[in-house]
């Protein structure tokens, strides 16, 4: 198959007018559009997709979301994962690393086993698990259930990782809690440690980073604000070039001005767009649940009954659009932050995150308004 005349988003983060050859479900070559490539392609006797006037981008990679279309990662069933992977694929998210919640110990073990045993049925590829809780701070729990919060427990984590067959890619911790630094030392190099749901001050966050934490979960949310005399976690993450930070750009969690300021402070190469979506995403307003707690959804806003924001009701493609349209971030940067950056962060960049020879042919064709025209996974068009 050859995708011709596309405006291709290339691995170097720029656009090129070109043709992309797909063979056996993988990208075979990416060719700049010339008369020579046109003649070579025409003689290949392959299926031709004319993408004139369209933008071709890698399939998006969401490394932090909980559910969509009525299903949640913590439902712990293959059927829920089928729903999640199908919906995410339909909105251009072709690789997913869904997040767990702070649920009961045995229940979390069951959720991990379900994901580890999951058999791929098409749709988005399940490439990892983001373990958001239970190793967090009670004072910054957000929409997590307080009764299930616990101290970092390396043996329990290993039990969960075994049940998941090694699928846990990120684990969230509050570094100020007892045992957190020792836990980072124990798991360093085997999983990405993310600072999350934390009341840590600057020095404590710096210590965690020095011991191996390299990621910040939904920056600004469930952590102390940036203050000019107390920079906290945000300042510590900013000061460490090896740290990457998630942003929920759904129009609810972070003001567009702060999105712009964050890109200016950190640089796009360190930003990761996430959706943090919950099961109401893709459905109508109403009453739902997240981590066993009741959630009310009105438009893009999802809240607990006390008003606490409870994830989002927006998918990653819409978050990327918001980043461009409302926050004014260049399209090239927004795409990178929703594709290459998250893929690199969880160690799947050899398979996903860019349109490059040898990688899975997961890609999206968009029009100039960033509306989806078609989605391809493993070189096959899926129903949107």
Segments (PLM) and residue ranges:
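Histidine-rich, glycine-flanked metal-binding segment
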Residues: 1-2, 8-57
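Divalent metal-dependent hydrolysis catalytic cores, especially in the metallo-beta-lactamase
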Residues: 66, 82-111, 124-137, 164-176, ...
């Amino acid at each position: 198959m050859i995708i011709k005349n596309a405006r291709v988003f290339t691995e170097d983060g720029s656009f090129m007018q070109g043709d992309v050859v797909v063979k056996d479900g993988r990208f075979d070559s990416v060719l700049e559009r010339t008369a020579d490539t046109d003649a070579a392609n025409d003689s290949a006797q392959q299926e031709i997709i004319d993408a004139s006037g369209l933008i071709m981008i890698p399939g998006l990679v969401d490394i932090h979301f909980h559910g969509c279309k009525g299903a949640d990662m913590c439902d712990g069933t293959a059927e829920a994962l089928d729903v999640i992977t199908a919906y995410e694929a339909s909105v251009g998210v072709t690789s997913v690393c869904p997040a767990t919640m702070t649920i009961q110990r045995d229940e979390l073990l069951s959720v991990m086993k379900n994901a580890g045993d999951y058999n791929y049925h098409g749709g988005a590829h399940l490439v990892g698990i983001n373990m958001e809780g239970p190793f967090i701070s009670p004072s910054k729990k957000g929409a997590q259930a307080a009764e299930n919060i616990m101290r970092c427990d390396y043996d329990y984590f290993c039990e969960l990782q075994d049940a998941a067959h090694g699928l846990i890619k990120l684990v969230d911790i509050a570094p100020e809690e007892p045992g957190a630094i020792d836990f980072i030392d124990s798991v360093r190099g085997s999983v990405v440690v993310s600072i999350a749901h934390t009341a840590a001050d600057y020095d404590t966050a710096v210590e965690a980073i020095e011991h191996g934490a390299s990621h910040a979960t939904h920056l600004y949310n469930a952590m102390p604000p940036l203050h000019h005399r107390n920079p906290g976690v945000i300042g510590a993450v900013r000061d460490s070039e090896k740290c990457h930070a998630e942003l929920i750009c759904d129009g609810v969690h972070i003001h567009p001005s702060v999105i712009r300021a964050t890109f200016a402070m950190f640089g796009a190469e360190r930003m990761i767009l996430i959706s943090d979506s919950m099961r109401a995403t893709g459905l109508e307003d109403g009453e739902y649940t997240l981590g066993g707690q009741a959630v009310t959804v009105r438009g893009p806003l999802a809240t607990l009954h006390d008003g606490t924001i409870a994830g989002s009701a927006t998918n990653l493609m819409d978050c990327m659009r918001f980043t461009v349209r409302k926050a004014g971030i260049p399209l090239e940067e927004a795409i990178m932050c929703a594709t290459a950056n998250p893929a690199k962060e969880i160690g799947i960049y050899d398979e996903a995150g860019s349109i490059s020879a040898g990688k899975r042919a997961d890609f999206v064709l968009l029009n100039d308004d960033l509306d989806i025209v078609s989605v391809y996974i493993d070189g096959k068009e899926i129903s949107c």
